[in-house]
C-alpha cells in the first residue's frame, strides 16, 4: 500500500508539472525556434534599405521568441513592385518571410501601376526605423540650381523602375510644373543609381536625401551636389531653406497629389508581414521590432554609420497605407494621367 501511495503521489506531481509546463508553453517561440526568417528587401544590396536590415537583424533575433535567424534577401526590380508582389502572393504566409519595401509601395497599389498585384493596406506593418524625406538631388556641374532651371534645361535622372518614386515623382512634376527631367529606369536598387551617377551616366535622382549622406559622403565633402527641391510635407531638417514642391503648385488637385507623394515618408523604411501571417506571430514580430529599435546598441550602430534613426509605429504605417488606398479618385486620376497610366 505504501508503494502504491508513493506511485500515486508521483503521478500527481507529474500531472501537475505537465499542467504548469503546458501553461508556460509559448507556441510562437516553439514555431520560430530553429527557423530562419527571410527579410525580403525591395532594393539592391548597395542601398540604404539593406544597411538598415543588416543593422537590425541581430537585434530581431535577440528579441523574437524562439530566437530565429534573420537573413537578408535582396529583391530589387520594377521600383519595388517585384518584392511587394512576391510577399503578397508567393512568399510563405507563416511568418518566416517578412519584408522591407519602398515608400511608394502603397501609392503604386492605389495608382494600379503596371505590374502591381497587391493591395497595400492588406500587408501587416511591423514598424519603421526611419522616415526618410525625399528631394531632387543633382550634380552642380549640370548648372541646374532650381526647379525653374529644370524647366529650361533637360537633365537625366536615374531610377530603379516605374513603380518607384525615382520615376513617378519626377514624371508627375514634369506634368504639373513643366520641368524637363528625363528619367532612365532599370537600375538595380539605389546602389545602381549611385554607381550610374559616379560614372556620369545620369546626373541626379529624386529620392531620399539622408541616404546620400552616409552612402556618398564624398559628394558632400567635394561640394558636388545641389538639392533643388524637397518632396515632403516638412522641410529637410538640415536644409530648411530648400523649397517644398507642394508650395510650387497652385492647382488644388495637383497640390493634393504632391501632398500624397510627400506623405509617404512614414512608409520609407517600412517593415511588414504578408497578409496571411497569423495574428499572434505578427504581434510577436511587432514587439520584437520595437524592442530592436529601442535597443541602445542599435541606435549607437545607426549613429556610427551616420544613419537616421526615426521610428514609425506599425499603427501609423497601417493608417497611412489605408489613407492612400482610400485617396480621392480625382487626385488618383490626375496622377495616373501624368504617368500615362490609361
Task: Set out the residue ranges of the language-model regions.
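An extracytoplasmic/periplasmic, membrane-proximal ligand-sensing/linker region
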Residues: 33-37, 221-224, 276-342
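Bacterial N-terminal signal peptides
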Residues: 8-18
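Short beta-strand->loop
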Residues: 121-129, 180-186, 216-264, 313, ...
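Sec/Tat signal peptide C-region and signal peptidase I cleavage site
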Residues: 19-25
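A ligand-binding cleft/hinge motif common to bilobed small-molecule-binding domains
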Residues: 103-115, 167-176, 204-248
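Hinge/capping helix and adjacent helix->loop/strand transition within the periplasmic-binding protein
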Residues: 37, 62-67, 86-97, 105-199, ...
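Extracytoplasmic "Venus flytrap"
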Residues: 38-53, 76-79, 158-165
Amino acid at each position: 500500500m505504501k508503494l502504491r501511495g508513493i506511485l500515486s503521489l508521483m503521478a500527481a506531481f507529474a500531472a501537475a508539472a505537465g499542467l504548469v509546463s503546458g501553461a508556460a508553453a509559448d507556441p510562437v517561440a516553439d514555431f520560430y525556434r530553429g527557423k530562419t526568417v527571410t527579410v525580403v528587401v525591395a532594393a539592391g544590396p548597395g542601398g540604404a534599405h539593406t544597411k538598415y536590415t543588416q543593422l537590425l537583424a541581430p537585434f530581431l533575433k535577440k528579441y523574437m521568441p524562439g530566437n530565429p535567424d534573420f537573413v537578408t534577401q535582396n529583391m530589387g526590380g520594377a521600383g519595388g513592385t517585384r518584392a511587394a508582389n512576391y510577399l503578397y502572393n508567393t512568399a510563405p504566409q507563416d511568418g518566416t518571410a517578412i519584408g522591407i519595401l519602398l515608400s511608394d509601395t502603397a501609392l503604386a497599389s492605389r495608382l494600379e501601376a503596371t505590374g502591381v498585384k497587391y493591395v497595400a493596406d492588406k500587408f501587416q506593418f511591423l514598424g519603421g526605423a526611419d522616415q526618410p524625406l525625399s528631394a531632387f538631388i543633382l550634380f552642380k556641374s549640370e548648372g541646374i540650381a532650381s526647379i525653374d532651371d529644370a524647366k529650361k534645361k533637360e537633365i537625366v535622372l536615374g531610377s530603379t523602375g516605374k513603380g518607384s518614386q525615382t520615376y513617378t515623382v519626377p514624371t508627375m512634376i514634369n506634368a504639373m510644373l513643366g520641368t524637363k527631367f528625363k528619367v532612365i529606369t532599370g537600375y538595380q536598387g539605389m546602389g545602381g543609381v549611385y554607381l550610374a551617377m559616379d560614372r556620369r551616366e545620369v546626373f541626379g535622382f529624386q529620392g531620399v536625401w539622408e541616404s546620400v549622406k552616409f552612402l556618398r559622403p564624398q559628394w558632400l565633402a567635394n561640394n558636388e551636389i545641389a538639392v533643388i527641391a524637397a518632396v515632403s510635407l516638412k522641410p529637410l531638417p538640415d536644409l530648411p531653406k530648400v523649397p517644398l514642391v507642394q508650395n510650387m503648385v497652385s492647382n488644388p488637385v495637383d497640390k493634393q497629389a504632391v501632398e500624397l507623394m510627400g506623405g509617404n515618408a512614414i512608409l520609407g523604411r517600412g517593415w511588414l508581414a504578408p497578409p496571411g501571417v497569423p495574428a499572434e506571430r505578427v504581434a510577436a514580430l511587432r514587439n520584437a521590432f520595437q524592442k530592436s529599435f529601442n535597443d541602445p546598441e542599435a541606435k549607437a550602430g545607426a549613429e556610427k554609420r551616420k544613419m537616421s534613426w526615426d521610428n514609425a509605429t506599425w499603427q501609423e504605417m497601417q493608417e497611412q497605407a489605408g489613407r492612400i488606398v482610400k485617396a480621392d479618385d480625382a487626385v488618383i486620376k490626375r496622377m495616373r494621367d501624368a504617368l500615362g497610366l490609361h
